[in-house]
Amino acid sequence: MPVSSRASPSRILWAAAFVLTLAASAPAVAKEVTVTIQNFAFTPANATLAAGDTVTFVNGDDMVHSIVADDGSFHSDGLDTGDKVSFPFAKGGTFGYHCGLHPFMKGQIVVK
């Protein structure tokens, strides 16, 4: 008796349901947002990201800078030219920050 190589409709439906279940349960990939410090400013000054994402600050200035959260939840030591520091954001919220050495330098991170 010949064997059919054609998939039955029920097999196709089960396979589709399986693939959709895998896709729906796959964890989101965390993203890294880079904020550059240059000319006494953060670029971008305002960043929006998802919970689980990381913000990396890179000092492109020829001056030492530091990162300080307005609410004290994170801070860095002084960053020399080319130095970088990363902060993961696990939960939602709005986080204002500034340079600890130059308080007029400000930014905001919104975590959704």
Per-segment meaning from a language model:
Residues P2-R11, A15-L20, S25-K112:
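Extracytoplasmic copper-binding redox domains, predominantly the cupredoxin/blue-copper superfamily
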